[in-house]
Amino acid sequence: MSMSLYGDYIVEDETGFATYRFLSDQKAVYIVDLYTVPGARGDGRASALADRVAAEAKELGFTSMIGTVAPSAKGSTRSLRVLLAYGMDLESAGPDYIVMKKEI
């Protein structure tokens, strides 16, 4: 029986979670999903989850963090605001994606 290692790439607490993957060729960690329950939004809990991912990535020698937003997705404006507030800068964009990046 083979087991999934996906659990190795998630941080969570009672208010939310972040899933991520390492992009070795870019020395970056990519935040795949970041979610907090509505009652926990706006108080830094999403940043705390991202900080945990960044700390692990930095310990492993990664130097940046990447996040993406699909402009056509519901809530995309709020998602973009969250990434900007976390200190990410525009890296690139396409017809339905925005890539943000932050040095860690």
What are these model-derived regions, one by one?
Residues 27-38:
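Conserved acetyl-CoA binding element of GNAT-fold acetyltransferases
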Residues 93-104:
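STAS-like cytosolic regulatory interaction modules
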